[in-house]
From Swiss-Prot:
It comes from the Eukaryota. Keywords: Membrane, Peroxisome, Phosphoprotein. Required for peroxisome inheritance. Belongs to the INP1 family. The modification Phosphoserine is found at S273. It holds the Pfam family Inp1. This is Inheritance of peroxisomes protein 1. Transmembrane segments: none annotated. It comes from Saccharomyces cerevisiae (strain YJM789) (Baker's yeast). GO terms for biological process: peroxisome inheritance. It is found in: Peroxisome membrane.
Amino acid sequence: MVLSRGETKKNSVRLTAKQEKKPQSTFQTLKQSLKLSNNKKLKQDSTQHSNDTNKSVKAKKNGTSSKKTGTQRKRISTQRFSLFTYGNVQVMNSFVPIHNDIPNSSCIRRNSQVSANNVTESSGVFFNDTQSQDSQNTIKLKPTSLMAKGPIEIYQICTGFDKLKENIAPFQKSSKASSHDGHVVNYLSIGRHGDIVHPVLPKLQITRLNGAGFKYFISFYNPERYWEIEFLPLISQSQSELENSVKAFENVISKICQFSHINEGATIGNNESLSDKFKLPPTSDIEPPNTEIINNDDDDDDDDDNYDDDDLNYLLDEEYEQGCTDNSFSVISNTCSNLNASFLYPSDPTDAVSISINEAFKNAIRRTAPVLNIPIAAPSIHSKQQNKRYSSYPFIDSPPYLQDRHRRFQRRSISGLGDL
């Protein structure tokens, strides 16, 4: 039994070998050939794709490396030149109030301010009323805050130059911009760590105030803003060294921006406006009101004093209140007419305050004066009312002896006393 089993195994192996040796059909051979060709094509495509990816990666690497080298070259071509340095400077931010009011109201306010400021002075100062956007019509220059204190530096940045010659001064290149393809920009740096950096353009205006130390005013496109730069002496520095450094500063800024001088006499007080530099000549459209004082004779002065006494007696004496009749109307009308005729703008600074106060008091009397239409033979009711105080009388509006325009103008003039 054992042998039979071994023989059967051998026979089965021989049969399988014979079956494999049998020739295959044409369909099977075609199928196998197609499989082999497809496998070869897939291998070739995969190899080509891998080669393409390797080439693209190499090209990208080469492009990034070239870009890096290009940026490095640009950085090398940009150079910084220091034109001026100084160690001790104080910078104040100044504000200039500009009024854009109606010309008449602005005249009144400014005249009141001038009269108040010049009470203790013998000469008065009058401002021009011309206002425009281009001109800087200022009243006072007020330093508001300290911006920086420390060193100052003016430097220049040159970009786009292939080769920079060392023997040419940097600020001379800016004057010949057409001879090269580069770009030149000047900057003003203030502070230890460059706290304030501002570009110095050719249209920037820098003005020196002569006679008040070493002060310079930088004006911007906003006419209400100024920078006041003051050069302070360093430790153990002589006056001549300070003057030399200031001259070097002026020499540099005169070549890169607009630089000018102005005298101290053109200003009003300390740290105040640059008056004549930013003024325009007066135009025919806007004219200030004529300020005159009529010198009356002694008789006119006595008459005015009598009118003032009458007004005061009319307010204070009770006996005069009891005996007031239609004659009071003539007194009030005469005072009103005289005041209306002599209502003028004072220009003398010594008498400006007193005259304005008297006029305001007279105007107040005119407004509060009652119009009493009481007959001579008054009944008992009126006699009781006459014994009362002045504040208890029933007031009646006075007739319109002045036009509305004059009333408005008088109210403005009285309100202007608040500035005094």
